[in-house]
Amino acid sequence: MGKKNGSSSWLTAVKRAFRSPTKKDHSNDVEEDEEKKREKRRWFRKPATQESPVKSSGISPPAPQEDSLNVNSKPSPETAPSYATTTPPSNAGKPPSAVVPIATSASKTLAPRRIYYARENYAAVVIQTSFRGYLARRALRALKGLVKLQALVRGHNVRKQAKMTLRCMQALVRVQSRVLDQRKRLSHDGSRKSAFSDSHAVFESRYLQDLSDRQSMSREGSSAAEDWDDRPHTIDAVKVMLQRRRDTALRHDKTNLSQAFSQKMWRTVGNQSTEGHHEVELEEERPKWLDRWMATRPWDKRASSRASVDQRVSVKTVEIDTSQPYSRTGAGSPSRGQRPSSPSRTSHHYQSRNNFSATPSPAKSRPILIRSASPRCQRDPREDRDRAAYSYTSNTPSLRSNYSFTARSGCSISTTMVNNASLLPNYMASTESAKARIRSHSAPRQRPSTPERDRAGLVKKRLSYPVPPPAEYEDNNSLRSPSFKSVAGSHFGGMLEQQSNYSSCCTESNGVEISPASTSDFRNWLR
């Protein structure tokens, strides 16, 4: 019976270990154990003295099994003191009849507690092992997934890098293949050109050789036809004759080739010489053609006509003395700011002044020459011969000066003034002394050159304006500018104004020679 109970208790312990520990199961197990015990008591009834050892014997065997089950499990603090509290009184000096019931009651109370705690510990161990196994499996799965993912990513990156390297290598291979093909093509083309040139040269040489061979063969045939001897000859004699003919043909070919080469060289040299001669002829013909073209140019006629027109225009040369300053006294002398008259007006006033009687001034006068600034007008020796001097000397006490005007024109001013004097009134007619003075001044004076005169001759002004026509000298009152209002009263005031203007011009410009570019300003000032 003890074995059965032990086996049943072991099976129940195993079953309880695999079941989830709950309070209901624990209470049910306790109730089942009590019911089994009751059934056993019903079937096996014994006296009380015998039942106690049976009970003790029935209860005592499972104790070591439970202890063997709980070897690994730590004993709880409640069980240890229970053993300590229960065992000492059993060893006390009492009769065995009193000890047995106490042991049975203690065993009855301690057995369910031990079983309960053993089941709990076993269940906790199982739960922990299962949970730890679950965690380990989950970590393993996660690790496997991570490893797979890393392997995939790394494999993708590696494949991508490998593809890029392969593409780069393919591109390099393509470029190298193209370069090699191009080099091969160029070398092939060069070889073809060289081969073509060589073949062309060989063809030309062969062609020349064929021609020479044909010529030699024809000559040999002609010579053979002419010189061939029908008489029988030995083989040695025939060989000698053939060798001789071949030698002559070779010499003839060599001479022909040398002649052809010399002719070719002569042609090239002749062509070069003819080209050089042609270039020399062209260089010699160019200036001739240029001269002919310049001789027939269209603007030459216009230039010649312009020169002839310029030669026709006469230019008045006025000589003004600047070596000696002019003296101005009295209130009748005009101011510098007044505007001088035009060239035509000056000529008119010179004509009107010529009608007054005047005496020569003792003061020495030196002429200042106002020459032409235009390079177009050239001197004519006939005009130099036909020069006429016109001088006017004032006898007024306030102004003593002597002007000398030289006009390069076909007719002199003095003759025109003398001829026009008859048209003037009697009170304006010139006297005999004035006419004699004019005649005496008409011839040019020959003065010896001195250093003072040479130095004074350097200080000159250049002006050019055309000589007015002779009709202007005939009218005395009509040729006046409308802007010239200051001399409308009398000729004497005009004379003073003009003389003062000339003196101011000379005093302001002492030591200055006006260039042709600056003559326009002086013309504007004289207007």
UniProtKB/Swiss-Prot annotation:
Family in the record: Belongs to the IQD family.
InterPro entries: DUF4005, IQ_motif_EF-hand-BS, P-loop_NTPase
Amino acid composition bias (Polar residues), ranges on this chain: 1-11, 49-59, 352-362, 391-401
Positions of short motif Nuclear localization signal 1: 2-9
The species this protein was found in: Arabidopsis thaliana
Motif (Nuclear localization signal 2): 22-29
Domain of life: Eukaryota
Keywords: Calmodulin-binding, Cell membrane, Cytoplasm, Cytoskeleton, Membrane, Nucleus, Repeat
Protein name: Protein IQ-DOMAIN 18
Compositional bias per record (Low complexity), positions renumbered to this chain: 75-92, 330-345
Gene: IQD18
